[in-house]
Amino acid sequence: MLVLKTTDKEFSPRFQSLVSDRREATVDVSGTVRDILAHVKARGDAAVQEYTSRFDHYRPHSHHLSAAFIAEQAAKCSDEVKAALELAAERISSFHQKQLPQDIGYTDTAGVKLGLNWVALSQVGIYVPGGRASYPSSVLMNALPAKIAGVERIVMTVPMPHGEINPAVLAAAQVAGVTEIYSIGGAQAVGALAYGTETITPVDKIVGPGNAYVAEAKRQVFGTVGIDSIAGPSEILVVADRQNNPEWIAWDLLSQAEHDPSAQSILITDSESFAQQVIAAVEQILTTLPSQKVASSSWQNHGAVIIVRDLAESIPLLNQLAPEHVELCVDNPQLLASQIKCAGSLFLGRYTPEAIGDYLGGPNHVLPTSRSARFASGLSVYDFLKRITYLECNQAALQKIGQSAVTLAETEGLPAHAGSVAVRLQGLKDM
């Protein structure tokens, strides 16, 4: 765990080292993934069966999960879990419903009609991890925006190691309106969604997090299908003053550290004594935390505490780090928030732990990582929509603007472009 002070002479190079810390998997899996995708593309269901048997020790007669099986598994969830999923779905849906954009249409001064129509994607694939990262909340966060956007076919793949699955994942799929579910994981699932098999119709876009193999598979199929992003390890940055309870902040830091040994948790504070209290609280919590092994590895190898002269000094540091999650645990969080340009999502005030956003705050928890918040945004309804523009010229409008189009086409040396306009202009003169 790194401790930095902006007053130290060596702060700048040490901070830049933190900014450039590459926490993604260092093993090159591109060749393995390329082979898996090629086999799935060429051999379809047979290849999917072989990889599922090899990696998940599971060989079903069909990977398609029936409505009866889904209902049977979902029924295993307690009433409390079902109610929590319903509440989360309600809040997520409400926020994303408000994102739906309006079509644009107008007639300009030349008499040309112009516009833009929003159109939903036809079919989308959602990858849901198994194992440690089997999260029903991710089902809601990926599927609900697609449903609200108007996607008609929402296909989910989820691995079932040894034939087992988290019932809450299937309950969440029911709540979110997923239309098809297949028990496939890994790069082979991405291949099946992208290329299709004898039993799986290919989709137009693939969203959802996964391990290094899934991330690389999404990278390789991009172009054949759309993708949301290449997800990296989780991140949280907490800006906190001395008025906070250090134990609260420690729990917040560990909430992301427990995701992955490569996750990163950073505290920025203007109080050195408070920083030491938080560090001590983290160490104390780790002694009894069930996820101690993962969280401790993350904290020790990638955690950081930065002590600044004042909280205003945190803003340029934060914008350079461009973290996935930012908590502003200060008296006037809106003041700092207005200056933040690079972050996935903000959590304002002392009573808004990031975990609320993970489950049922409303905004999406699929957020840019690995400093991609410099240029990317979290998952939203817009990820499941396309924009189609249109133009309509009548005779008078073409006569007003057409000759300029001919001039530009001739300037670019494209005579057929020029001719397609000029022939119409001549036709209008001859009328």
UniProtKB/Swiss-Prot annotation:
Its cofactor is Zn(2+). Keywords: Amino-acid biosynthesis, Histidine biosynthesis, Metal-binding, NAD, Oxidoreductase, Zinc. NAD(+) binds at Y127, Q188, N211. Its EC number is 1.1.1.23. The active site is at E324, H325. InterPro entries: Ald_DH/histidinol_DH (IPR016161), Histidinol_DH_CS (IPR001692), Histidinol_DH_monofunct (IPR022695), Hstdl_DH (IPR012131). It is an enzyme of class 1 (oxidoreductase). Transmembrane segments: none annotated. GO terms for cellular component: cytosol. It comes from the Bacteria. Substrate binds at S234, Q256, H259, H325, D358, E412, H417. Zn(2+) binds at Q256, H259, D358, H417. Catalyzes the sequential NAD-dependent oxidations of L-histidinol to L-histidinaldehyde and then to L-histidine. This is Histidinol dehydrogenase 1. It comes from Nostoc sp. (strain PCC 7120 / SAG 25.82 / UTEX 2576).
